[in-house]
């Protein structure tokens, strides 16, 4: 998989130049490898389950562009569809049939969505859905969960992922306290904390938003009854329940977490997979609520590139591919083999670890666990994870460069890829 010696000379040169051109040398912070040390490798191309860097090193990829590459990178049918779409233009700024097609697929696939609006990113979708929550309820406060990430909009940068654990204070300079004052936080998987917030702020909370399976504090699944409990509480309080399924939508089941767990939210955000690797986001829900969105209603939201034909094309083809029989069974099979193998090898090597998976989404923590929330996740041995990440990179395996990010498999990953990954892990974990 690698060249005879692990050489990243070209990556180092390109990244050094990038740091003079872009803040930190990247266009999204996690890419800079700050959490794991060293400098990032610079990609040259991707295909299937593999990525190649500019030095010619090949890696088995478990990041998948942070989730969209569920079919594998550069799937030939997606590429073919995009070539045909390019011949018609890159952006219309006007209605096109492709929007209808993808909208129908999303509505058919996601149980709670009756109407949908396309945007250009998950952050945009979450920004819009917060405005919609407030417009519909006439209330201003929201509840989010520690470690859940809903994009980089001001109102969500409170205890977001690896943010500062302070009460009601923003996790980034430049975010006014007045903006985050209406953002209430609770520990994930803690229904009593949610009930207490509603009791402390009667008739003031517009809704509860969460990643139904946390992926931005590492992989943290919901405890049994947690999602159903939130549904019950919000209905009792006249508040909305919002699932941020940017990561889990079409990933852990075709209908996302709401299909997997049988709990229907009022509103849902989507992204990643529905764009097939191109920039996209969406939000949707009950017709009654979505009818407030302009121009049907008074809640304004717009976007120059929203619904652009290239993203719609890639999304349509991707959903066509993954709705075929056996997709999620296969993802579950190979991901179970991967995470169970990693856990076994790590424990045999004397490390305290825990982890798990749902379909093609997984995570591993260097702590005995269990991990139920962000505070539990922070008990992970970050130095050990960093060494593990670097060792796996040198063995030709590309993992997310942060302990606080979930990993992903794809339909392009084979049993042989998993075997090679576990062989690499055995070498690395026995050396830590």
UniProtKB/Swiss-Prot annotation:
Pfam families, per the entry: Aminotran_3 (PF00202)
Q: What molecular function does GO assign, one term?
A: glutamate-1-semialdehyde 2,1-aminomutase activity
Reaction(s) catalysed by this chain, per the record, are: (S)-4-amino-5-oxopentanoate = 5-aminolevulinate
Q: What is the lineage of its organism?
A: Bacteria, Bacillati, Cyanobacteriota, Cyanophyceae, Gomontiellales
The main enzyme category here is isomerase
Q: How does it assemble?
A: Homodimer.
| Name of the protein this chain belongs to | Glutamate-1-semialdehyde 2,1-aminomutase
- Subcellular location field: Cytoplasm
- Chief subcellular site? cytoplasm
Enzyme Commission code? 5.4.3.8
Q: In which pathway does it act?
A: Porphyrin-containing compound metabolism; protoporphyrin-IX biosynthesis; 5-aminolevulinate from L-glutamyl-tRNA(Glu): step 2/2; Porphyrin-containing compound metabolism; chlorophyll biosynthesis
What are the annotated GO cellular component locations?
cytoplasm
Checking NCBIfam families in the record gives: hemL (TIGR00713), PRK00062.1 (NF000818)
Keyword set, alphabetical order: Chlorophyll biosynthesis, Cytoplasm, Isomerase, Porphyrin biosynthesis, Pyridoxal phosphate
Q: Which co-factors does it depend on?
A: pyridoxal 5'-phosphate
- What is the scientific name of the source organism? Cyanothece sp. (strain PCC 7425 / ATCC 29141)
Q: Which residues carry this modification: N6-(pyridoxal phosphate)lysine?
A: 272
| Annotated family | Belongs to the class-III pyridoxal-phosphate-dependent aminotransferase family. HemL subfamily.
A Gene Ontology biological process term: protoporphyrinogen IX biosynthetic process
Domain of life of the native organism: Bacteria
